[in-house]
Amino acid sequence: MPTTPHVEKHFTAGAAIRDIVIGMSDGLTVPFALAAGLTGAVDSAAIILTAGFAEIAAGSIAMGLGGYLAAKSDAEHYASELAREHHEIGHTPETEREEVAMIFESYGLTEAEVAPIVEALSRRPDSWAEFMMRFELGLEKPDPKRALISALTIAGAYIAGGIIPLAPYMATANAQTALIYSALATLIALFIFGYI
């Protein structure tokens, strides 16, 4: 009887989506707020565009840097916790074995079922530490490239979002008219972005 291999498809781009949401939402709102405020003060679409693009440049740098630092902090936190787990495995192995047993018992396994698993895991210190990181602390090993990818994704999404409220100011010299279209474009973009 022929068998078809079981293939599971899981969504694995959660971090990238999070970065896009962070960058795009700020990119839509901050330049719009700046353009709306300036429209009340000046009637020159060119001045508003200049200020808007300056804000997009500064905002994308700040947001990208924030994403970079957050991802680096996550990686540093993971590394320090991993070192602590290795230390605990080396210095208090019985306590760590009990913690492993409690984790498996929380899934309904009996003490007799858990004992060989704990024994096998305790012979592999690196796997043991990784297991504790994931199941005791709830930490996943971060991608070493994550900081740069996060920075670029957030900054790019900020720029893309920021262009939307400024686009009407590029299309018309009348700042008041541009503000109306900018508000509509921003609201529609926020609705679509929030819906997706």
What are the functions of these language-model segments?
Residues D26, L65, V114-I117, Y158:
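Residue-level signature of catalytic and energy-coupling elements of molecular machines
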Residues A36-A51, L166-A178:
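Helix-coil boundary and interhelical linker segments in multi-pass alpha-helical membrane proteins
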Residues M1-T12, A16-R18, K72-I154:
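Cytosol/matrix-facing amphipathic helices and coiled-coil assembly/linker segments
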Residues A16-A35, K141-A167:
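Transmembrane alpha-helical segments and their cytosolic interface motifs
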